């Protein structure tokens, strides 16, 4: 992996499709964006929502980065979906083998959970351990890995709980923070330093705050959001509060993207598209005179 590939993974997970995803969240959960009993204006609330989304997506990006590193080092990546006896599917963060031992990793960005979440995390870890131990026996090794070394709130708890599981299942289990995974498991401490350098470079290249005004780049915004599900557009157009309280105006400042959408929907065949075109036309005339 090089710096360009590293950035590509981060940008793909964190920024690609974020306009469409924001509109989807507004359509499905409008109450999170509207209401007089919020101390923030619509633009600030939208910005807050985007930043929270970036935090979540960062974890997804780091999962792919670790997977690519494992591939580069010669490990075979296995399917991350496993099935419980009741048919419920579980998803592994990392699952791979060196040809002799089978490894699974429960990977999180930081260890800052409260008591209920840390217990839930251990319960989730054991559920995966139970399934995989039946499949691989003593050839299995499990890891709990927190990438950010500055957060280790529940370290003692995890050490104690992993020791209990280790003794019960007879499986090698390890807890790592930050560099420890690269140093003790991968034997590549220099690679950790490289990742830190790449992260700093990537962060330095970002704007101070994400752009919430879709009309700043109307054609680009249009291309991304024109494929949003019809039901989401219907909910947005039917919810007058989103328009009256300025939520949609905070996203579409001058209406230029909405006008492109209106022309697009108006040119498509089918009653739903005509309904959307008519609905957009009414909103444009009312809120962008």
Regions found by a protein language model. Give the residues of each.
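N-terminal "first-domain core" detector
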Residues: 65-66, 76-77, 88-92
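Active-site beta-strand-loop-beta-strand hairpin of nuclease catalytic cores
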Residues: 88, 92-105
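Short His-Asn-centered micro-motif
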Residues: 80-81, 107-108, 143-149
């Amino acid at each position: 992996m090089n710096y360009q590939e590293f950035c590509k993974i981060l940008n793909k997970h964190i920024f690609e499709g974020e306009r469409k995803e924001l509109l989807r969240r507004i359509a499905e959960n409008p109450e999170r964006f509207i209401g007089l009993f919020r101390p923030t204006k619509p633009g600030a609330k939208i910005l807050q929502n985007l930043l929270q989304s970036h935090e979540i997506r960062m974890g997804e990006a780091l999962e792919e980065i670790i997977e690519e590193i494992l591939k580069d080092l010669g490990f075979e990546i296995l399917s991350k979906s496993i099935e419980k006896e009741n048919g419920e599917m579980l998803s592994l963060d990392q699952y791979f083998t060196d040809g002799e031992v089978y490894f699974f990793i429960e990977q999180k960005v930081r260890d800052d959970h409260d008591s209920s979440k840390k217990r839930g995390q251990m319960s989730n870890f054991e559920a995966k351990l139970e399934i995989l131990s039946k499949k691989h026996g003593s050839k299995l090794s499990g890891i709990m890995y927190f990438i950010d070394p500055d957060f280790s709130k529940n370290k003692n708890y995890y050490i104690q709980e992993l020791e209990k599981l280790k003794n019960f299942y007879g499986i090698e289990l390890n807890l790592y923070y930050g560099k420890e995974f690269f140093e003790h498991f991968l034997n590549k401490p220099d690679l950790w330093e490289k990742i830190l350098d790449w992260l700093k470079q990537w962060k330095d290249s970002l704007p101070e705050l994400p752009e919430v005004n879709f009309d700043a780049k109307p054609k680009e915004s249009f291309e991304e959001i024109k494929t949003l599900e019809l039901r989401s557009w219907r909910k947005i157009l039917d919810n007058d509060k989103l328009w009256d309280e300025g939520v949609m105006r905070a996203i579409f400042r001058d209406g230029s993207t909405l006008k492109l959408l209106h022309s697009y929907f108006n040119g498509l065949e089918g009653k739903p598209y005509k309904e959307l075109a008519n609905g957009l036309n009414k909103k444009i005339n009312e809120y962008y005179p």
